Regions:
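Phosphate/NTP-binding elements of NTP-utilizing enzymes
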Residues: 94-483
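Protein-protein interaction interfaces in oligomeric scaffolds
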Residues: 2-95
């Protein structure tokens, strides 16, 4: 049986063990504090050295570059590489605290400088509803690359205007931007506006849900419950409380969302000029972005009538770009002009009575405006791949406008040149068909024909006559006023 002395000895032993443990913990804490202090000093020195070299690195990056857009991209690249280097060096300097160094490197690492087109090429899938199912390939529609890349987070462009013919992929570029914002940026609210709430529910929502289901990186961000919930017709929540707000331009209430940095307006030429007695919907939309300096807006539409076409007015305020492609014979660049250089040949059905005979287009080609050689549609794929956008007003840097017609439709993904020529032939002597052709196939505004007076010439004929002078001359018979609406 243990004696009192045995109990006292055991108590002393346990006290000694506890004292040693406390001492070891104090020493470890002191060492950890010293290691942390040394790591913090090392990181501080790295940051101070990096800040000191920024001016030289920036000057070296842009060198003699004068293009504002290129300067923006080059500076972004310089900052990106500098932050990555700091992260690596900090991890090495904090070898005594590997977890601290790893966390600092991870926290200082910037997002990849990914463009919208690069994101689409990596992550976008289209399984149905297209002539080219499978993984998205920007190379099939190369004219969309610059349009999408202007919407990238590190692009200096804040407004992108696309005036286009139907069936050229403009709306798919919009969906790629949505996917880019959801997956790559992850925390940016976005407002999508279509002409009406009915169109939102009938067309946009199903297409958006389809894209999310087809892209694994997007479907992972959106819960199945939120996608099927009845109260999600106007808002899609994803990721860390980010939202896509879906509105109709015919509803002022739907445009009263919280402030958002990014806005996409599809088919803007179909928007009403006043909504709900509250004025222009485009003004209401712009008000949602006013608190953001790094905002982006996409305006996408086929045009309508001259003088009342929103997309045409927006394009005229932009830098006005057209897609130029090289002639396969002489190599000179030109934009494809339907009215002046597009040619076709027709044949008349001989087995039909003269009054019912129909002209059938049997061939179509393009004539180079530089060398006069005939360009066949089979040359178009290589021409599109080598094409480039050329601005009429290159001095406008932040508002990029793109105009493109149906002649550029990739082979197998749209109307052929023969199809377009046939639609032109069929539209003759029918103003409604002709208007649809001009708007949807040429991507141009429809101009009503008539004998209206030129405004400038009319104003030049204005003269002032006082009532007294006319009465004195005995020439005042009556005053007539009229208006023509």
């Amino acid at each position: 049986m243990p004696t009192l002395a045995d109990h006292q000895t055991e108590k002393a032993r346990l006290q000694a063990i506890a004292a040693k443990r406390e001492f070891d913990e104090a020493v470890a804490a002191t060492r950890a504090a010293d290691d942390l202090r040394q790591a913090a000093l090392a990181v501080r020195d790295l940051l101070m050295a990096a800040l000191a070299e920024i001016p030289e690195r920036f000057a070296e990056a842009i060198a003699s570059e004068r293009d504002e857009t290129r300067v923006h991209y080059l500076l972004s690249d310089a900052v990106h590489s500098l932050l990555e280097r700091i992260g690596r060096q900090a991890e090495q300097a904090c070898a005594a605290l590997p977890e601290f160094g790893e966390r600092f490197r991870h926290g200082s690492r910037p997002r990849d400088l990914l463009t919208v087109s690069q994101w689409a090429d990596r992550h976008r899938w289209i399984t149905s509803g297209t002539n080219a199912p499978g993984k998205w390939r920007t190379e099939l529609t190369p004219y969309l690359r610059d349009i999408m890349d202007d919407l990238s987070e590190h692009s200096p462009v804040d407004t992108v205007v696309v005036q286009k013919a139907s069936g050229l992929g403009g709306t798919e570029a919009l969906y790629n931007w949505i996917g880019y914002d959801m997956h790559h940026l992850g925390n940016r609210d976005m407002l999508i506006v279509v002409p009406t709430l009915e169109l939102r529910d009938r067309s946009f929502n199903p297409r958006l849900a389809k894209m999310i289901d087809e892209c694994p990186v997007l479907s992972a961000l959106v819960s199945r419950a939120s996608r099927s919930s009845a109260n999600r017709v106007d808002i899609l929540e994803y990721g860390a409380n980010a939202r896509i707000i879906k509105a109709g331009a015919n509803s002022a209430d739907s445009l009263r969302s919280d402030h958002v940095p990014n806005v996409a307006c599809d088919e803007v030429s179909a928007y009403k000029w006043s909504v709900g007695g509250e004025g222009d919907p485009m003004t209401l939309i712009a008000n949602r972005q006013r608190t953001f300096t790094r905002r982006k807006t996409l305006l996408n539409s086929t045009p309508t009538n001259e003088g009342e076409c929103r997309i045409d007015q927006a394009y005229k305020r932009s830098n006005r770009q057209r897609y130029h492609v090289p002639c396969p014979h002489c190599g000179e660049y030109q934009h494809l002009d339907f009215r002046n250089n597009f040619k076709y040949r027709t044949a008349i059905d001989e087995d039909i009575s003269p009054g019912d005979q129909h002209k059938t287009v049997v061939a179509a080609w393009y004539v180079c405006r530089h060398c006069g050689a005939e360009i066949q549609e089979g040359d178009k794929t290589a021409m599109l791949a080598a094409g480039r956008w050329i601005a009429e007003r290159p001095y406008i840097k932040r508002r990029h406008g793109y105009q493109i017609n149906g002649l550029y439709a990739p082979i197998g993904l749209g109307l052929t040149w023969v199809d377009i020529a046939q639609r032109w032939v069929d539209a003759q002597n029918d103003s409604t068909k002709l208007q649809a052709f001009v708007n949807t196939d040429l991507g141009e505004v429809w101009k009503e024909e008539g004998d209206g007076a030129d405004a400038t010439s009319l104003l030049a004929r204005v003269e002032n006559y006082s009532r007294e002078s006319l009465e004195a001359a005995g020439r005042l018979l009556r005053v007539v006023a009229w208006t023509d609406v």
